[in-house]
């Protein structure tokens, strides 16, 4: 009897999941159709270069809702991520359709809002995660988190493991959209607009303001942090690298800034040698740096979640473990993105 009940419950849960997925897909496609019909009007608000990117997100999300989880995700973790970023993308589209934007200060948990660009006056999306323990009476750490190429702020911030670390450390996470084709080039000011908006919306600890980036974002932190070095307590580079052309600027502007450099030993997109050479350069320049390598890690952020949790905790605590024994084969910093 217990087995029959269990099977019945399992069937009911499966039916509910299928129905919820179908409903979610219908909602995404319905909003996408409304968005497409008003794309010209929306372009005057967001700028023409990214207007259709947001439309494409809705279509992609609808496909993800019906897709099986990738082999490196559990079903629950995948569903949490997909639900998270699809809800953020829906919120983005609905706000643009209504031309009414959620105040950043009102967000609790996972949310999406817009910040007006100081560069061109357009409205630019920013994903936000505010941990449940946040109180305006207690200053919180802030991480401004930069996503990778061909990704989005919503997909970067939605996974459960990001929320888990943010909850554990009490960190507010703010992820601006990198609308430049590569390396946040041309949209650097959007990062600082998001940073300024977060400092106005929340009570932020001035001694715990961090800049982090993954993949393309991991390269970009070395361009963006030197622009206003006093804004950042520490910088985290995940599956990215410092390039030789930026080394003098980093050495001059960020000599006292703590760096946390992360890599997967099996990364075949940004070879682990790149972050290794970055850590060697920073160490030899006398800049505080800690290096983390995940032996089974690839370029996927999910595969680096263990060392991300450790590095995040070290960053919050101000811990620096100067790396020893790193081998770069006598090579200097890379000059270009692989």
Predicted regions, residues:
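Cell-envelope and extracellular/periplasmic
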Residues: 147-151, 199-202, 214, 221, ...
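Gly/Ser-rich "nucleophile elbow"/oxyanion-hole loop immediately N-terminal to the catalytic nucleophile
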Residues: 132-139, 184-216, 229
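Bacterial N-terminal signal peptides
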Residues: 8-17
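Short substrate-entry loop that stabilizes the transition state in hydrolases
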Residues: 134-185, 244
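A domain-start/cap signature at the N-terminus of enzymes
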Residues: 22-140, 320-338
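C-terminal catalytic histidine-bearing segment of alpha/beta-hydrolase fold enzymes
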Residues: 25-43, 52-54, 59, 260-262, ...
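Primarily recognizes the serine-hydrolase "nucleophile elbow" in alpha/beta-hydrolase
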Residues: 200, 207-255
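Alpha-helical scaffolding within the catalytic cores
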Residues: 155-163, 194, 240-251, 273, ...
